[in-house]
Amino acid sequence: MVSTLKRDEALFELIALEEKRQREGLELIASENFVSKQVREAVGSVLTNKYAEGYPGARYYGGCEAIDRVESLAIERAKALFGAAWANVQPHSGSQANMAVYMALMEPGDTLMGMDLAAGGHLTHGSRVNFSGKLYKVVSYGVRPDTELIDLEEVRRLALEHRPKVIVAGASAYPRFWDFKAFREIADEVGAYLVVDMAHFAGLVAAGLHPNPLPYAHVVTSTTHKTLRGPRGGLILSNDPELGKRIDKLIFPGIQGGPLEHVIAGKAVAFFEALQPEFKEYSRLVVENAKRLAEALARRGYRIVTGGTDNHLFLVDLRPKGLTGKEAEERLDAVGITVNKNAIPFDPKPPRVTSGIRIGTPAITTRGFTPEEMPLVAELIDRALLEGPSEALREEVRRLALAHPMP
């Protein structure tokens, strides 16, 4: 931590408090991770001082010679990482990436089809409380009651009935692989654009552990944190440069002004790290840890939605244990284990309560946790949920966390 912050005592204490929480706890929120020191250095660099409206070679401000090269480097690395012909690294977030893509491909009132939030989708895939549900007519698809897997027959039936302009494949709480080929065939059948939101599994795609949507999607959006382990931000990719030009105009000047070039530098670092061989091994362990942790909890009587996972996350149905997601989140938080309450498919409880929790392994894997340690993590989770919080259990969690240093 920067020592000069000590002059601002109130803020220094709060940052120190959060650093202590991260260092002494087990971070199991699927959308969180720990960036490298190199990413933090880039994000905290002098690039934060520079305004750079526009794109490399076409700025509205002078003095962008180095900035242009930084952003161009990030673009080229993103393209190489995912095999894309075009990339935009300026979105401030995944939500803004989705907004720009929708605005480039649709007009207000057009039909957007995406995964229902209650089935594992994201707010930006058509939730009525989100811009996507306010600007567009929304049709939502879900999962089968028997398997809890995406119902492709329903997807096709809804697409044929409603003729959406855009079909979104992607989710924030779906633990299985996506059949992008089948989605593209459905999109082509109804004349829709296929947009894949790979925010959660982008790092796994980069490592070759999840199907790559680029050969099938018209446009791919993502965040740059989560499994990609970069700074918080957004990314848009496509193999259609003409579509890319339309999206460029929607990012700037459409919905954003000056890009955050210090964050873009952090993205460039993360893309470089993800291009290294060791990132593949890291990602392999993320998936293996998720599988082993899900199996260990299942052996303790917890119902795992879909019966397991293919990626970095899984959902736990707590109804057999007589707990709500809210209760579980609070009990685990009290001993230093961080998860989030999450709806399960066909959940009878409201979103602020839920019947389940979502668990992910990117962050603990970054700290060096191995598959062999997942039964112990499952034991700690089980004890916190069934016995309730205690100082003794909190100390066990703390010791385990401190044995695995943060980057």
Swiss-Prot record:
Primary localisation category: cytoplasm
Residues annotated with N6-(pyridoxal phosphate)lysine modification: 226
Positions with a binding annotation for (6S)-5,6,7,8-tetrahydrofolate: 117, 121-123, 242
A GO CC term attached to the entry: cytosol
Cofactor: pyridoxal 5'-phosphate
Subcellular location: Cytoplasm
PROSITE patterns in the cross-refs: SHMT
Record key words, sorted: Amino-acid biosynthesis, Cytoplasm, One-carbon metabolism, Pyridoxal phosphate, Transferase
EC assignment: 2.1.2.1
GO biological process: glycine biosynthetic process from serine; tetrahydrofolate interconversion
Single GO MF annotation: pyridoxal phosphate binding
Function according to Swiss-Prot or TrEMBL: Catalyzes the reversible interconversion of serine and glycine with tetrahydrofolate (THF) serving as the one-carbon carrier. This reaction serves as the major source of one-carbon groups required for the biosynthesis of purines, thymidylate, methionine, and other important biomolecules. Also exhibits THF-independent aldolase activity toward beta-hydroxyamino acids, producing glycine and aldehydes, via a retro-aldol mechanism.
HAMAP family, A to Z: SHMT
Description of how the protein assembles with itself and partners: Homodimer.
Protein name in UniProt: Serine hydroxymethyltransferase
Gene source species: Thermus thermophilus (strain ATCC BAA-163 / DSM 7039 / HB27)
Gene: glyA
